[in-house]
Amino acid sequence: MSGSTLLKETGPREVFCGLTSIVWLHRRMPDAFFLVVGSRTCAHLIQSAAGVMIFAEPRFGTAILEERDLAGLADAHEELDRVVKSLLKRRPEIRTLFLVGSCPSEVIKIDLSRAAERLSSQFNGQVRILNYSGSGIETTFTQGEDGALKALVPLMPSSQEEQLLLAGTLANPVEDRLKTIFNRLGIQKVESFPPRESTKLPAIGPGTKVLLAQPYLTDTARELKDRGAEILQAPFPLGVEGSQLWIEAAANAFKIKKTLVDATLEPLITRAHKALKPYVEQLSGKKLFLLPESQLEIPLARFLSNECGMKLIEVGVPYLNREMMGPELDLLPQNTRIVEGQHVEKQLDRVREHHPDLVVCGMGLANPLEAEGISTKWSIEMVFSPIHGIDQASDLAELFARPLHRQNLLNKKTLEAV
């Protein structure tokens, strides 16, 4: 692992739960519905995060666990069956129904896998019913997508055909752009997972080479590998450096000539560096502290350090998959401090001690830190923003330059007022 310093920490955490991933997954697969089996708090979280009013009939909902369910006085499975039947009668366009576990449903031991099997047999031919956990008891919010994709892998058809599979949700325009680049390189068969329709799953087999677009798909990658696919080792496509190496990993796997790869990528790289320049001027030399939440922390640290000139104080990660993160770790500066796990109070003490120019953290910590005069960037914004690929490098840098620019404006106004 390069020259980084790895420490482990345990204690109280401050993270969103996996239910949050429903917000981008339901937009990605409009023919799917996500039914959370949880509390009113779960319902409020999803609705608030998605910014969708319930009367707009979004493609997610919550089967509320009442006090009788939590006390074991009611049969939660009977209630769930009733809710599902009512939902499918009212929304016949649903093609895939995900039963999503939550902290409350896991605490009272509702077996959603058994419920999914039972309901699938009842609605066979009409809708596919799957389940996964969105609980935040031991996971971070991005792992919800990992659970959903893992549930879909067994349904993927088998194929011996040689193809490239991009695994992990990408913004549609970004995905289209990346596919165009791969097509120009001569890789004609490029599929995406998850697909834009839940029923149109790509086939998979020994001829499939997988590029992970997101660093939090540990279980999904394992399932794809078990189906015979090859997981390509590469940094993640954040920034120019990571995106170039990511694309080159696929080109090497498909034996594409280096001259063609260079000719295809060099114009994109030149344009991206030009677009990055004004943001590098704002970010260079600034101190950065990343608190653990999204699992994007290491690729972001690599980009902000290597391409934007920021100084890394600490890179916190919820957990570290050394095999998956190996290529990223090799690119980090020497002596980068990486902390796996979280004791939020101790980490906040270190933030205050070093007083960084920018802290990347969860929404729950942002306002208190801002009140102490420390600029922050919400880590959840990285998941909702189109930041992948060479073309998006400047947009990614702008996300981090924006709070620093805002702080400069506020400081100027304060001085003028004085």
UniProtKB/Swiss-Prot annotation:
Please name the HAMAP family in this protein's record: ChlN_BchN
According to its UniProt entry, the protein's GO biological process terms are: light-independent chlorophyll biosynthetic process; photosynthesis, dark reaction
Briefly state the protein's biological role: Component of the dark-operative protochlorophyllide reductase (DPOR) that uses Mg-ATP and reduced ferredoxin to reduce ring D of protochlorophyllide (Pchlide) to form chlorophyllide a (Chlide). This reaction is light-independent. The NB-protein (ChlN-ChlB) is the catalytic component of the complex.
Give the GO molecular function terms: 4 iron, 4 sulfur cluster binding; ATP binding; metal ion binding; oxidoreductase activity, acting on iron-sulfur proteins as donors; oxidoreductase activity, acting on the CH-CH group of donors, iron-sulfur protein as acceptor
Keyword set includes Ribosomal protein: no
What does the similarity note say? Belongs to the BchN/ChlN family.
Q: Which UniProt keywords apply?
A: 4Fe-4S, ATP-binding, Chlorophyll biosynthesis, Iron, Iron-sulfur, Metal-binding, Nucleotide-binding, Oxidoreductase, Photosynthesis
Residues recorded as binding [4Fe-4S] cluster, renumbered to this chain, are C17, C42, C103
Catalyzed reactions = chlorophyllide a + oxidized 2[4Fe-4S]-[ferredoxin] + 2 ADP + 2 phosphate = protochlorophyllide a + reduced 2[4Fe-4S]-[ferredoxin] + 2 ATP + 2 H2O
Which EC class is this protein assigned? oxidoreductase
- EC number of this enzyme: 1.3.7.7
> From what organism does this protein derive?
Prochlorococcus marinus (strain SARG / CCMP1375 / SS120)
Pfam families reported in the protein's UniProt record: Oxidored_nitro
- Name the UniProt record assigns to this protein: Light-independent protochlorophyllide reductase subunit N
InterPro entries in the record, alphabetically? LIPOR_BchN/ChlN (IPR050293), Nase/OxRdtase_comp1 (IPR000510), Protochl_reductN (IPR005970)
> What taxonomic lineage is listed for the species of origin?
Bacteria, Bacillati, Cyanobacteriota, Cyanophyceae, Synechococcales
Query: Which coenzymes or cofactors are required?
Result: [4Fe-4S] cluster
How many cofactors are bound and how? Answer: Binds 1 [4Fe-4S] cluster per heterodimer. The cluster is bound at the heterodimer interface by residues from both subunits.
Q: In which pathway does it act?
A: Porphyrin-containing compound metabolism; chlorophyll biosynthesis (light-independent)
Self-association state and partner proteins as the record states: Protochlorophyllide reductase is composed of three subunits; ChlL, ChlN and ChlB. Forms a heterotetramer of two ChlB and two ChlN subunits.
Which superkingdom does the taxonomy of this entry point to? Bacteria
